[in-house]
């Protein structure tokens, strides 16, 4: 998959976007297209956090072989968080669930993304 700047038509690969960070024109890199295949969402509900992360990321980081991506997500999320599930989700009602973010170091979602980012940079 190619990535393009939000301020120009500059296009680069995912590894280049990871390493470069911002585009030369100061824009952000976004996917050239959104990979929105038909997904049976019920098939995702029983995946672990690592499995779900790999499932989503392989659609956006097509330059990374699937086996490598699984190894990267496994390394990033194994032994890093206090909960076995990484982010436990507690069902409050049939229509409402809450992610228990207090199991991550700063109690914020950024811990999830930033745990994987260094592994992606090393791979790139």
Identify the meaning behind each predicted range.
Residues 1-124:
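PLP-dependent amino-acid enzyme catalytic core
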């Amino acid at each position: 998959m190619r990535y393009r700047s939000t301020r120009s038509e500059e296009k680069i690969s995912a590894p280049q976007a990871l390493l470069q960070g911002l585009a030369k024109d100061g824009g952000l890199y976004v996917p050239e297209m959104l990979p929105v295949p038909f997904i049976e969402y019920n098939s995702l509900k029983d995946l672990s956090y690592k499995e779900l992360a790999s499932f989503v990321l392989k659609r956006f980081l097509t330059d990374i072989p699937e086996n490598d991506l699984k190894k990267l997500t496994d390394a990033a999320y194994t032994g890093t968080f206090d909960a076995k599930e990484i982010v436990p989700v507690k069902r409050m009602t049939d229509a409402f669930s809450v992610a228990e973010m207090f199991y991550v170091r700063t109690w914020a979602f950024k811990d999830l993304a930033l745990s994987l980012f260094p592994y992606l940079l090393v791979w790139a």
